[in-house]
Amino acid sequence: MTKVTTDVAALILRLAAGAIFLPHGWSKVAGEGGTAAFAADMATNYGIPTFLGHLAPWTELVGAILLIVGLLTRLDALLLAGTMFVAAFIVQLPEALYEVPPDAIKSFVVLRAIELPLAMFAACAAIVLIGPGRVSLDALLRVEERFRALLPKKKAAAEAAALV
């Protein structure tokens, strides 16, 4: 794969994921009861801490915008991947297993319940791995280069580890 195709793939993934997350995040933030209603539902029905119930909608909404423009992309995609992992396996999967109609094919019902959060988890994981690409604010502002400059150099890290 060439650098250009990787950049195009990253752009397509970012735009598609952002376009999907944006209305989902907005509906939770601006919907009836806002994040408080969403957080209460997550705490009551799924045992998810209220703080995370408040954080998830904002992660989806702000994360969508950051993905689309390609700013803080790897961190953003990592947070969104975590949110989608919880959505797929803690919220959707148990509910699907519990509420399968008697005449339904169980595996299809379960897959259908988790397919969107699972696909979004995969998209975000791919973005974490390939990065934002050159068509992003991260590339324009050299965010990843600046972050790497803050990290200890390999030699210094090895020397520090040898002291321990």
Question: In which residue ranges do the predicted regions lie?
Answer:
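Membrane-interface interhelical connector segments
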Residues: 29-50
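Extended, low-polarity transmembrane helix blocks
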Residues: 1-30, 50-57, 62, 69-164
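Short polybasic/polar patches that bind polyanions
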Residues: 42-44, 67, 128
